[in-house]
């Protein structure tokens, strides 16, 4: 089961990165292999944001939808994502955001991923590092795009 952790400095305000990660409806615009994304439900309190969302992931001939449960602890700046249904046997990713200053933040990203299909899971294992880096870069590129748009 592939698992990876990275800590990276983003040259963008924490609030921009935070909003970007939670803007699931727009993942289809920038996230590799994401062909559609939609928030199904969202509840917000003063300390938590609770989201259920569907993401359609496609690569070559394979395409599938998985539903995820996203919990954002506003005070801890921690986002936890788990798969609820779909082709993923295991999906857990954790984002922890730390403000460095008004224009920079540190992003800790951990992903633990396993597909239900054994053959596809073996293929995933071989390209996991590449995919992980590509996904993280897509968030960084999107942050740059949003920063330049303001």
Map each language-model feature to its residues.
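Intrinsic-disorder/low-complexity, polar/charged segments enriched in Ser/Thr/Lys/Arg/Asp/Glu/Gln
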Residues: 1-7, 50-52, 65-67, 78, ...
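Hydrophobic pocket/interface hotspot
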Residues: 17-20, 27, 53, 70, ...
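Glycine-rich portal/gate segments that line the openings of hydrophobic small-molecule binding cavities
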Residues: 39-84, 138-141
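Membrane-proximal extracytoplasmic alpha-helices
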Residues: 131-135
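Short, highly charged C-terminal tails/helix-capping segments
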Residues: 140-150
């Amino acid at each position: 089961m592939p698992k990876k952790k990275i800590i990276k400095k983003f040259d963008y305000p924490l609030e921009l990165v935070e909003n970007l990660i939670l803007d699931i409806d727009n993942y289809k615009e920038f996230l590799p292999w994401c062909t559609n994304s939609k928030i199904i439900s969202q509840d917000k309190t003063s300390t938590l944001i609770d989201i259920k969302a569907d993401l359609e992931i496609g690569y070559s001939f394979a395409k599938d939808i998985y539903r995820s449960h996203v919990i954002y602890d506003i005070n801890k700046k921690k986002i936890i994502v788990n798969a609820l249904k779909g082709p993923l046997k295991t999906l857990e990713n954790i984002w922890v955001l730390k403000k460095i200053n008004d224009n920079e933040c540190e992003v800790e990203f951990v992903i633990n991923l396993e597909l239900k299909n054994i053959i596809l899971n073996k293929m995933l294992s071989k390209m996991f590092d590449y995919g992980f880096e590509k996904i993280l870069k897509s968030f960084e590129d999107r942050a740059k795009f949003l920063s330049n748009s303001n």
